[in-house]
């Protein structure tokens, strides 16, 4: 699966990023998301596979395309059955966020990207649109930090594992009222805080790359993005833990349902028997082979955003494989029209 689909999923996120980037700075976050969804789905349907969306734009009645349960790929099309022999058929589960950080795109801010993760069937946790408490840290701190420990304890552990003072650590936290106490604790411990308005996938995986000046992600964000982050962190060897948050009283507002009971039922309907379980990266992305791909829409810590020029654009993407244990940055020049995409070496 790695060799067959790796390059194609790069093109999937590239097309989504280019489509969304055309709406950068126009204040139209919904449009920026919609065009990314359409572009991602169109390119995905050209891949020789039978794919199933396990994390997408919402449940079937909430989204017109890339909804949870939707099948994508050539081998799901009625007129392509002859092309898809059973013994050669690749069946995969897919988690997507065609425009992570819609507000960032709408207002021309840094950090938005098109992302997806894939694995063989059953290899990704099907997480509904609830929240997730998250902890991401560098590989050297893997299995030493713990989401059930305080921020102060975890910062001390990270500083010891990295052989640096707590004051030299930078922790990314989403700028939300629910994180007021967490932010205060991190600062009192001596570490520095980088607040972000949206898009915590990039922050999570940046912990696994030296030189990003990001050493931890803490706090509560969306669960679907947590699974996508876990897919990347599993392949990179970084630390990631997530615990589903299904009680609206904890977050006050956002993605989840009207009551705790409603959300518990939704979790059970999706096969999650223990809603309080703490998952690690290997449990959130448990497949034998896991691939992660992202393409910058606006500039970020890891990738440049889409840069347009007359009749073309330049993108920077990242593809991570658990099988080959590699993270590849791909710099691509796209010549619009009939000219094929050129990849810079």
From Swiss-Prot:
Pfam families for the chain: FBPase_glpX
Keywords assigned by UniProt, alphabetized: Calvin cycle, Carbohydrate metabolism, Hydrolase, Manganese, Metal-binding
Binding site for substrate: 100-102, 131, 176-178, 198-200
Cofactor list: Mn(2+)
EC number(s) on file: 3.1.3.11, 3.1.3.37
Pathway membership, UniProt: Carbohydrate biosynthesis; Calvin cycle
Ligand binding (Mn(2+) 1): 33, 57
Molecular function via GO: fructose 1,6-bisphosphate 1-phosphatase activity; metal ion binding; sedoheptulose-bisphosphatase activity
Catalytic activity: beta-D-fructose 1,6-bisphosphate + H2O = beta-D-fructose 6-phosphate + phosphate; D-sedoheptulose 1,7-bisphosphate + H2O = D-sedoheptulose 7-phosphate + phosphate
Gene Ontology cellular component list: cytosol
Binding site for Mn(2+) 2: 97, 100, 225
Alphabetical list of InterPro entries matching this protein: FBPase_class-2/SBPase (IPR004464)
Enzyme superclass (EC): hydrolase
Entry's Gene Ontology BP terms: fructose 1,6-bisphosphate metabolic process; gluconeogenesis; glycerol metabolic process; reductive pentose-phosphate cycle
Subunit structure of this chain's protein: Homotetramer.
Annotated family: Belongs to the FBPase class 2 family.
Summary of the function given for this chain in its UniProt record: Catalyzes the hydrolysis of fructose 1,6-bisphosphate (Fru 1,6-P2) and sedoheptulose 1,7-bisphosphate (Sed 1,7-P2) to fructose 6-phosphate and sedoheptulose 7-phosphate, respectively.
Name of the molecule in the record: D-fructose 1,6-bisphosphatase class 2/sedoheptulose 1,7-bisphosphatase
């Amino acid at each position: 699966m790695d060799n067959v689909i790796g390059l194609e999923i790069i093109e999937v996120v590239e097309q989504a990023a280019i489509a969304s980037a055309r709406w950068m700075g126009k204040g139209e976050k919904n449009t920026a998301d919609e065009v990314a969804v359409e572009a991602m789905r169109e390119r995905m349907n050209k891949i020789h596979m039978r794919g199933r969306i396990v994390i997408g734009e919402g449940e079937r009645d909430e989204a017109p395309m890339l909804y949870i349960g939707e099948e994508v790929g050539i081998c799901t099309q009625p007129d392509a059955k002859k092309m898809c022999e059973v013994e050669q058929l690749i069946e995969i589960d897919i988690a997507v966020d065609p425009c992570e950080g819609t507000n960032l795109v709408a207002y021309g801010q840094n950090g938005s990207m098109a992302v997806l993760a894939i694995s063989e069937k059953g290899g990704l946790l099907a997480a509904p649109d609830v929240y997730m408490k998250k902890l991401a840290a560098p590989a050297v701190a893997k299995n030493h930090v713990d989401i059930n420990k305080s921020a102060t304890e975890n910062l001390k552990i990270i500083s010891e594992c990295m052989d640096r003072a707590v004051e030299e650590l930078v922790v990314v936290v989403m700028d939300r009222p629910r994180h007021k106490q967490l932010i205060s604790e991190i600062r009192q411990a001596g570490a520095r805080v980088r607040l972000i308005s949206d898009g915590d996938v990039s922050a999570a995986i940046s912990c696994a790359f030296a030189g990003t000046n990001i050493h931890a992600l803490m706090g509560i964000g969306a669960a679907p993005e947590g699974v996508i982050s876990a897919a990347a962190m599993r392949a990179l060897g970084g630390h990631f833990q997530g615990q589903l948050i299904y009680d609206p009283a904890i977050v006050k507002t956002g993605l989840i349902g009207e009551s705790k009971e409603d959300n518990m039922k939704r979790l059970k309907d999706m096969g999650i028997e223990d809603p309080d379980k703490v998952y690690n990266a290997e449990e959130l992305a448990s497949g034998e082979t896991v691939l992660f791909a992202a393409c910058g829409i606006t500039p970020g810590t890891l990738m440049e955003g889409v840069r347009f020029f007359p009749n073309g654009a330049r993108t920077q993407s990242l593809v991570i494989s658990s099988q080959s244990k590699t993270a590849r940055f791909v710099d691509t020049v796209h010549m619009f029209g009939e000219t094929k995409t050129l990849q810079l070496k």
